[in-house]
A protein has these predicted regions:
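Active-site/substrate-binding loop(s) of hydrolase catalytic cores
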Residues: 1-87
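C-terminal accessory segments enriched in acidic
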Residues: 24, 53-185
């Protein structure tokens, strides 16, 4: 997994990406992922369609200036789509992972926005989410170009429920395992 190769940089691609980022020193970086469609918004029944994260650069989760910029972009993107997919937006877990490029780039002062595409019902190819992502990215680029993102707070972003694993494909309740034992599996 190249995304977990930021520290050791065993792959050629990891070395190229790291060197290039250090050369250009971006104010912002975007990390786009497809997350498992079984993630839920908090521990509820709603499937997470989109999850955001203004990636931390240390184990304390410090809000550095670069992380704040990323948080303002997350806030902006959240405001753009919360009326389109209400109740289906979450925040990716904020645990620091030193091997990950997002966390590593954030520690170097690059405002890293993680954008995770989850599930959208039975749209298993995530085409509807890809369209949303394209719109979100275009809007974020415009907000960065004109500086309008700086007026964003991060309150709504911070209040987002986290991604959880509360959804399953199949749940069998009260299954007989033997004549005297029953269980949910």
């Amino acid at each position: 997994d190249m995304n977990r190769d930021a520290t050791k940089q065993n792959s050629v691609e990891a070395r190229i990406l790291s060197a290039w980022a250090d050369e250009i020193k971006p104010e912002f970086a975007f990390n786009l992922h497809d997350q498992n469609r079984l993630y839920s918004v908090g521990n509820g029944p709603e499937q997470t369609h989109i999850a955001f994260l203004a990636t931390t650069g240390d184990e304390d989760g410090t809000w550095t200036p670069s992380r704040l910029r990323a948080g303002q972009i997350c806030q902006r993107m959240l405001r753009q789509i919360q009326h389109i997919i209400p109740g289906k937006i979450a925040k990716w877990t904020d645990e620091y992972e030193s091997r990950a490029f997002g966390d590593t780039f954030s520690s170097r002062g690059y405002g890293l926005v993680l954008l995770e595409s989850g599930g959208a019902g039975w749209d298993l190819e995530k085409q509807s989410l890809r369209k949303l992502n394209a719109c979100l990215l275009l809007d974020a680029f415009c907000a960065i170009a004109d500086g309008s993102y700086v007026s964003e707070s991060i309150e709504e972003y911070e209040a987002l429920p986290t991604n959880e694993r509360a959804i399953v494909d199949i749940k069998i309740k009260d299954a007989p395992l033997s004549s005297s034992v029953r269980a949910d599996v």
